[in-house]
Amino acid sequence: MANRQQPTSMPIHKYRPYEQVDIADRTWPDNRVTVAPRWLSTDLRDGNQALIDPMSPARKREMFDLLVKMGYKEIEVGFPASGQTDFDFVRSIIEDETAIPDDVTISVLTQAREDLIERTVESLVGAKRATVHLYNATAPVFRRVVFRGSKDQIKQIAVDGTRLVVEYAEKLLDERTTFGYQYSPEIFTDTELDFALEVCEAVMDVWQPGPDREIILNLPATVERSTPSTHADRFEWMSRNLSRREYVCLSVHPHNDRGTAVAAAELALMAGADRIEGCLFGQGERTGNVDLVTLGMNLFSQGVDPQIDFSNIDEVRRTAEYCNQMEVHARHPYVGDLVYTSFSGSHQDAIKKGFDAMEADAAAKGVTVDDIEWAVPYLPIDPKDVGRSYEAVIRVNSQSGKGGIAYVLKNDHKLDLPRRMQIEFSKIIQTKTDAEGGEVTPKDIWAVFQDEYLPNPRNPWGRIQVKTGQTTTDKDGVDTLTVEASVDGVDTVLTGSGNGPISAFFDALQSVGIDVRLLDYTEHTMSEGASAQAASYIECAIDGQVLWGIGIDANTTRASLKAVVSAVNRAAR
């Protein structure tokens, strides 16, 4: 088919394609991520600096406590040399002996100036586990425009900064602190690979990584500039060419300028990265840092333990929204208000059938649904695993069909409607949504269902109200039913005979001019135990109409008679 799109007048001449990596024998596409990486949350640093209203100390502490509770073991807590607020916060969590668990490492950021480095290391005095994170920009545009320096001069900034970190750590910190070092060639995505490698090697020459002396080399996509696959190529190239690789923790720090930060991080792991830096829900400068929640839940959905607890994802969201003063989008993966919700009729039908199949499979194996592999269409994970209920899984509007409506009735009211009754009732709901528009809530669905099918003692409707009924069976097996009822407002006694109570009731109705023919009948219990109620569903042909009725009662015979009354009264409505 021909492409009928037309060229635009947009100034594409201002931009050039991103340079590809010459790595013909790349191996990362064949790799799989089978264990969680090391995670670092930079919500309190990179995330906080991007807020319109940066966090107060109280909000910072609440965010820190949340990250610890979730299981993050590396947390970047600020830029203490940038101002007194960040410095005081770092000191406050160090001096509070209950704040930082023994297995949590705090990290602080600094530029490569001596006064800033000294102040940064000073903020860490008394910390149990701490890392200084030093960075300087290495990309050509920064060398030319910002620093106006040569490659050697830029490299020397990194070398001198690393040397100063070592000197001040030895001078200011004591044996109480397990000290680590991280270096980032900022704007790695726009830095020549051979130069990025050269700078990292020079930094390692100063730090001297070895057994029990790891170095973290963080390669940030400070601005996302390429496809995730090209980003992965760059990581594989660096991982292959770094010396002392066994003592290097190779870290990825994607931003989301092209909207592919999650994919970039995942492919970087396949290409050799050991660690990911990001923020909850993708907070951060411009389009944000990579989203740690999506990354962790992506692993979870593939059967890989993220080693971070997302079991109460709404609590995580509420805390993040409070601390950041920014809302999480309703469509945000795994956590948004609508991500486990289907409005489409075909989706809802598939979801309902998926739940039914899961229950049947579990019952056949003698286990619970939680013990078998999750397999429900349109739901990549079980919402219960992150603390969500099934209440919002199916919501009804004008695009919805029978499956969604039936799901609501079964899930909320234990009524498992027969398929043709589902179709009948969905048309009733469709009429309502077409007339009124918008969403129909589960409460609305139940109200319409009650009004359509079930008797209302406070506002009776229909020709017949049954008061009592009694069945006897003669020696030939013929049932005789005697019913005390109100017909068209007049109390009367109806009697009929037949093969079973329903047939006998049909015969009794003939005496008041109501001709009923049975088309289908089904019933089920609504719960377990001696006091369980039964739901009976009956499809009848009544005076040329085909209608369903429902009856609910602890006695199955009474339930079936109520179902007949429901259908008959609907026919006369």
Curated annotation (Swiss-Prot):
Residues 37-314 form the Pyruvate carboxyltransferase domain. Its EC number is 2.3.3.13. Residues 456-573 are annotated as: Regulatory domain. CDD domains: DRE_TIM_LeuA (cd07942). The keyword S-adenosyl-L-methionine does not apply. One of its GO terms (biological process) is L-leucine biosynthetic process. PANTHER family: 2-ISOPROPYLMALATE SYNTHASE, PTHR46911. Catalyzes the condensation of the acetyl group of acetyl-CoA with 3-methyl-2-oxobutanoate (2-ketoisovalerate) to form 3-carboxy-3-hydroxy-4-methylpentanoate (2-isopropylmalate). This is 2-isopropylmalate synthase.
